[in-house]
């Protein structure tokens, strides 16, 4: 999780803002994540990174599509 947050922190912040209600991350130094939504979100972002989709300008749309389909579980 630390690696994912460090590598994609801006995308992580974007993801946190997208949640309802929004999550308020304290920063990349947070080591223990217990909120299931955070774990699922980071897992989804990592999944997109592993598949190279984060390099695409429409990665947010792909992420939302993944979320709609149930996401990639943490």
Feature names for model-found ranges:
Residues 1-74:
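Short, flexible loop motifs at catalytic/binding sites
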């Amino acid at each position: 999780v630390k690696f994912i947050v460090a590598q994609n922190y801006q995308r992580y912040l974007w993801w946190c803002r997208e949640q309802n209600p929004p999550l308020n991350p304290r920063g990349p130094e947070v080591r223990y994540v217990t909120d299931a939504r955070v774990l699922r979100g980071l897992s989804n972002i990592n999944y997109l990174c592993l598949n190279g989709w984060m390099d695409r300008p429409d990665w947010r749309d792909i992420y939302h599509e993944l979320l709609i389909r149930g996401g990639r579980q943490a």
